[in-house]
Design a protein with these regions (language model features):
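Catalytic-core segments of thiol-dependent peptidases
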Residues: 67-70, 82-84, 98-177, 189-190, ...
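Structural motif
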Residues: 25-27, 189-190
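A domain-level signal for caspase-like cysteine endopeptidase catalytic cores
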Residues: 26-130
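Bacterial Sec-dependent N-terminal signal peptides
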Residues: 1-23
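Terminal, contiguous helix-loop blocks that mediate binding/assembly
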Residues: 12-14, 140, 150-382
């Protein structure tokens, strides 16, 4: 006796959309400044060149949300024309206003993509400025509005204007509301590889690819890494090593990137809760912890070096080291990283791939770090 499905037609597994990838380039400037727009266009051109080089998209459908001004955006699909060997834009939606910065707007955009291309796997790439875990409202003097010394251009500080900035919590909620979980979220933006962000996104993505430092304005080398991204089984180590190699051989040899397994964040938080219940860091020890930013006071500290500086006993120190290794799947940094904030470089002696703001006395940290999900999960009764 033979077995059949609910109908007599054979199920063609190759007909199933394996992966849907959304690339988001929200506005990174002001009403009068284009911010990183030209860099975003260049990144998209690199991706399209990689698609043409690979003669198609394999089993992935790629959608792009791009803001062309502060209040004008569009959503389109990238398709490969095998007759003309070109990448075409199939326009889906045009948007006016800044709803893309809100939970509701993000929910609609992600929902539209899901409706157009339901898939076995989803992934998200976000390009723009970044300040890390903190919210728009946390800043009384939004970083990019301050005058700075002449400096190399990076993707630092959130939007040039907080009107167009997006909270991590809004992104997480938008993804979860749509009933999906990303295979990975890649932030081509500064300061996004921190425990607070990774914990906030743990129910929205399996992996977080991000830098604990600033990223140069040109962003990631997409032609080099596209084949590692355009797959249901991304090669995170190769993405990171390609990024490192690309910048390490240039006149701006500043790059760091990490792949964080967000499914491990609950276990990491449990160990940190035990550490926090038993140990505190002295001012003298904190002064020696590896910093990852140019803020004054510092906002981001290397997680591994911070825990070492707590001087925990051997048992819990080993537990933490084992869990950190399970959480950070791959990470690499150049010998120095760059800070646009004060136009200087930071020597990297300790690099775990994740930062933490627990010990920070920066006004933004003091104002709201205790409100983060990470803090609440790692501190008893606070």
């Amino acid at each position: 006796m033979g077995l059949t499905g609910c109908n007599d037609e054979a199920f063609d597994i190759d007909s199933v959309n394996k992966q849907t990838l959304l690339i988001m380039y929200p506005w990174s400037g002001t009403e009068n400044s284009a911010g990183l727009y030209s860099d975003m266009v260049n990144n998209l051109n690199q991706i399209e060149n990689a698609i043409k080089k690979n003669k198609g998209l394999k089993s992935t459908r790629v959608f792009v949300f791009m803001s062309t001004s502060a209040t004008e955006s569009s959503l389109f699909e990238l398709t490969y024309n095998s007759s003309t060997f070109t990448v075409e834009h199939q326009m889906l939606e045009n948007y006016t206003g800044t709803a893309y910065t809100t939970t509701e707007g993000l929910t609609d955009i992600i929902g539209e993509v899901k409706q157009k291309a339901e898939a076995l796997n989803y992934a998200l790439i976000i390009g723009g400025h970044g300040t890390g875990w903190n919210n728009i409202s946390d800043w009384t003097d939004y970083p990019n509005q301050a005058k700075r010394k002449a400096a190399l251009k990076t993707r630092s500080f959130g939007g040039l204007d907080n009107t167009y900035a997006i909270n991590v919590s809004s992104l997480a909620q938008a993804i979860e509301t749509n009933g999906i979980k990303m295979q990975y979220i890649l932030f081509d933006a500064c300061y996004m590889s921190n425990v607070e962000t990774a914990y906030e996104l743990k129910d929205a993505t399996n992996f977080l690819l991000a830098s604990p430092n600033e990223i140069m304005a040109k962003g990631l080398p997409y032609e080099d890494i596209w084949s590692y991204l355009n797959t249901t089984t991304p090669n995170y180590a190769s993405i990171i090593s390609s990024y490192y190699s690309h910048y390490n051989s240039t006149s701006t040899p500043y790059a760091s990137l990490a792949a964080i397994d967000c499914r491990q964040m609950d276990k990491l938080a449990a160990i940190m809760k035990e550490l926090n219940s038993k140990y505190t860091i002295t001012t003298e020890r904190l002064a020696g912890v590896q910093t990852e930013d140019g803020y004054t006071p510092n906002l981001y500290y290397d997680l591994g070096n911070y825990v070492d500086s707590l001087k925990p006993n051997a048992s819990i120190k080993d537990q933490f080291a084992t869990q950190l290794k399970a959480t950070v799947k791959a990470a690499q940094s150049t010998a120095e990283v760059y800070s646009n904030i004060n136009a200087t470089t930071i020597t990297v002696k300790d690099f775990s791939g994740l930062t933490i703001s627990d010990p920070s006395s920066h006004p933004v940290a003091l104002r709201t770090k205790k409100q983060t999900k990470w803090w609440k999960a790692t501190h008893e009764g606070e």
